[in-house]
Amino acid sequence: MLSAQERAHITQVWDLIAGHEAPFGAELLRRLFTVYPSTKVYFRHLGDHPDEVQLLSHGQRMLQAVGVAVQYMDNLRAVLSPLADLHAQVLRVDPTNFPLVIQCFQVVLASHLQGEFTVEMQAAWDKFLTGVAVVLTEKYR
């Protein structure tokens, strides 16, 4: 459960990056593929060497989903249920990869927002994104 202050931190950070989902998402994917190359197996549709347009497109979709989660943080299960079904039943993404995505996204936030991304904001985002990952893994059986 997020506190009022944590919710405020999440919303404040999202307001700073909203509208920039594509470049932030592309950078997240580049970092993910560089640091954790084994994750590329879940992005076969991007090919072995995805071009910038592919990264921007998929990165935008990923972060738009995060934006929806931010908008409906009180109702994550209902909002993310279709995405959880997709990842568990269709894409069959190993849920151990979600923390890797979370880590890379937080690095992207920190590198762009620098001093604006405080320790408290990072902690709130870590808690929030971990909650998102929990919801996404609930459909695995």
From Swiss-Prot:
Gene3D superfamilies: Globins (1.10.490.10). Heme b binds at residues 58, 87. Keywords: Heme, Iron, Metal-binding, Oxygen transport, Transport. GO terms for biological process: cellular oxidant detoxification; hydrogen peroxide catabolic process. Residues 1-141 form the Globin domain. One of its GO terms (cellular component) is hemoglobin complex. PANTHER family: HEMOGLOBIN FAMILY MEMBER (PTHR11442), HEMOGLOBIN SUBUNIT MU (PTHR11442:SF8). This is Hemoglobin subunit mu. It comes from Bos taurus (Bovine). The gene is HBM.
